[in-house]
Amino acid sequence: MAKLYFNYSTMNAGKSTMLLQASYNYQERGMRTVQLIAAFDERAGRGVIGSRIGLEASAIPFEPDEDLFRLVMTLSGEGAPISCVFVDEAHFMTPLHVWQLARIVDRLGIPVMVYGLRTDFQGKLFPASQELLAIADEMREVRTICHCGRKATMVVRLDAQGKVLHEGAQIDVGGNEKYVSLCRRHWDDEMNGAWIAEPV
């Protein structure tokens, strides 16, 4: 039975690497996959999913107003059946895109695996991630670690001088030079200043 999977994490956890490996596993067995990425995310090139360890694969770039259900329905009528749809950087989608992916699962019977961030640098849910948390059939946390060794669940955004930013647009495409993954405690220290408990 097809399902909508949300694989979420903070930055630098290996989500894109996992996506590329999972898609390759299908392809190695002669199955067809469709890989999607937001058109404005050109870090690895337009229509390219790239990982920090150097793996890359071509993907179909989609625009904010694109109907992903219609796109996949059209593709499914061309060539071999589609065995799975993969979406990288899912937080760049709109909530409507999430529902279109759910329709791919429910109406076309094609599994959809999405990979993305849960929260932004201010600790707020991305709209698409919020929608995925609400309607995905299965959610899987992809883990990475803070510099202290604890599980990293948050991310801070840095300016060109490496200082932590507290304000700005929710979406700002960047990589290791712009974002650092931290545990909640160290994120709080960076965003709100080192907190010292008052004596009881």
Curated annotation (Swiss-Prot):
Catalytic residues identified in the record: E89 (proton acceptor)
Residues binding ATP, per UniProt: S9, T10, M11, N12, A13, G14, K15, S16, D88, E89, A90, H91
E.C. number: 2.7.1.21
UniProt keyword terms in alphabetical order: ATP-binding, Cytoplasm, DNA synthesis, Kinase, Metal-binding, Nucleotide-binding, Transferase, Zinc
BP terms from Gene Ontology: DNA biosynthetic process; thymidine metabolic process
A GO term from the CC aspect: cytosol
Substrates-to-products reaction catalysed: thymidine + ATP = dTMP + ADP + H(+)
InterPro entries registered for this protein in UniProt: P-loop_NTPase (IPR027417), Thymidine_kinase (IPR001267), Thymidine_kinase_CS (IPR020633)
Residues annotated to bind Zn(2+): C146, C148, C183, H186
Intracellular or extracellular location(s): Cytoplasm
Record GO terms (molecular function): ATP binding; thymidine kinase activity; zinc ion binding
Coiled-coil spans in chain: none
Description of how the protein assembles with itself and partners: Homotetramer.
Similarity comment text for this entry: Belongs to the thymidine kinase family.
Name of the molecule in the record: Thymidine kinase
Species for this entry: Rhizobium etli (strain ATCC 51251 / DSM 11541 / JCM 21823 / NBRC 15573 / CFN 42)
